[in-house]
Swiss-Prot record:
Binding site residues for NADP(+): S10, G11, V12, I13, S34, R35, R36, N321
Job of this protein: Involved in both the arginine and lysine biosynthetic pathways.
Cellular compartments per GO CC: cytoplasm
Keyword hit for Flavoprotein: no
Molecular function terms from GO: N-acetyl-gamma-aminoadipyl-phosphate reductase activity; N-acetyl-gamma-glutamyl-phosphate reductase activity; NAD binding; NADP+ binding
Family: Belongs to the NAGSA dehydrogenase family. Type 1 subfamily. LysY sub-subfamily.
Active site: C153
Subcellular location(s) of the protein: Cytoplasm
Protein name according to UniProt: Putative [LysW]-L-2-aminoadipate/[LysW]-L-glutamate phosphate reductase
Pathway this chain belongs to: Amino-acid biosynthesis; L-lysine biosynthesis via AAA pathway; L-lysine from L-alpha-aminoadipate (Thermus route): step 3/5; Amino-acid biosynthesis; L-arginine biosynthesis
């Protein structure tokens, strides 16, 4: 049994971590912190957990974490905050699983460029040692590390959809277009006025159409697979959903590529993966991925279509942004690191109909 602490447990992702870890056979949640709600019962902030947990939130501090005798610490903090915690946790011998961006990018200077930090990352050695927590690409690194950087939600969906094509050198890497649609829960517990219901309902609204910070992760990971620079034009949109991300990507083919070539690439990379399904079906109700069939799960559904007229490929992916895009992927990586079954605590099927 592993003892777990969640730093920043009162937010949307913190609540999802609590919910999932309470169903994990090898985890006991012993500590959950919140500056705002310290001293309050957890179920009063996360009403869905009433009857499942009687802990109270505590003030966040290293001393509180050490006093709890935790083995693993999940950090669900705003960007720029985890970097203050992780070095101390690692020094204390704990496994740190960070759901912010603070350890995702390998180049220290990228934090100035993409996150507007006043200086490069202050812990370049720890940054290098951290594993990018996308299990299907970095399983070996995740097993061996003490710091897991959980990928961004839209980055996860984008990378998984394109990775087989990039790895197989089936597309041109100089200009890939990625369009993402994300639900309102992606804004977290403290969004802007534009995340209020009357602004968000019945809307498809682009935001940060150029220079979105998830671009850095997508390019980093795809470039590693390609062995050369991959350039991605990434544009997200806010849409009228509570949960979910849907990605559509477009890329030029690198040569005369057939549909069987595409199938071989996707099956070769994902055919044995527990949490990735290839959805491309001429029969049935679901011809391509859909958010409806992944919500509430750790699945990534991917699909593709060949456009022979323009010599391009269109790719699709769908995930639950709070599970596969955050808490679920964190737990999947935790399971790998600790030698537990990869799907422990994550064996969910989407309710249907919803």
């Amino acid at each position: 049994m592993r003892r777990a602490c969640i730093i920043g447990a009162s937010g949307v992702i913190g609540g999802e971590l609590l919910r999932l870890l309470l169903g994990h056979n090898n985890v006991e949640v012993v500590c959950a912190t919140s500056r705002r709600f310290a001293g309050e019962f957890i179920y009063r902030v996360h009403p869905n957990l009433r009857g499942f947990i009687n802990l109270k939130f505590t003030q966040p501090s290293i001393d509180a974490v050490l006093k709890s005798e935790s083995d693993v610490v999940f950090l669900a903090l705003p960007h720029g905050e985890s970097v203050k915690w992780v070095p101390k946790l690692v020094e204390s011998g704990l496994l740190a699983i960070d759901l912010s961006a603070d350890f995702r990018l390998k180049n220290p200077d990228d934090y100035v460029k993409w996150y507007h930090w006043p200086q490069p990352h202050p812990y370049p050695d720890l940054l290098k040692a951290a594993a990018y927590g996308l299990p299907e690409l970095h399983r070996d690194e995740i097993k061996a590390t003490k710091v897991i950087a959980v990928p961004g939600c839209m980055a996860t969906a984008s990378i998984v959809s394109l990775a087989p094509l990039v790895k197989g050198h089936l597309i041109n890497n100089d200009f890939i277009v990625v369009d993402a649609k994300i639900a309102s829960s992606g804004a977290g517990a403290e969004g802007t006025v534009l995340d209020y219901h009357w602004h968000r309902t019945h809307v498809v609204r682009p935001y940060q159409p150029v220079g979105h910070r998830h671009t850095a992760e997508i390019e980093q990971e795809l470039s590693l697979l390609a062995g050369s620079q991959v350039n991605v034009a990434f544009t997200p949109h806010a849409v009228d959903m509570v949960r979910g991300i849907f990605v559509t990507g477009h890329a030029r083919l690198s040569g005369s590529i057939s549909e069987p070539d595409l199938w071989r690439a996707y099956r070769g990379m994902y055919g044995n993966e527990r949490f990735i399904r290839i959805v491309k079906d001429k029969a049935g109700l679901a011809h391509y991925p859909s958010v409806k069939y992944v919500v509430g799960t750790n699945m990534v559904d991917v699909g593709f279509e060949l456009d022979q007229r323009l010599n391009r490929v269109v790719v699709f992916s769908a995930i639950d942004n709070l599970i596969r895009g955050a808490a679920g992927q964190a737990i999947q990586s935790f399971n790998i690191n600790q030698g537990f079954p990869e799907d422990e605590g994550l064996r969910f099927i989407t309710p249907y109909p919803v």
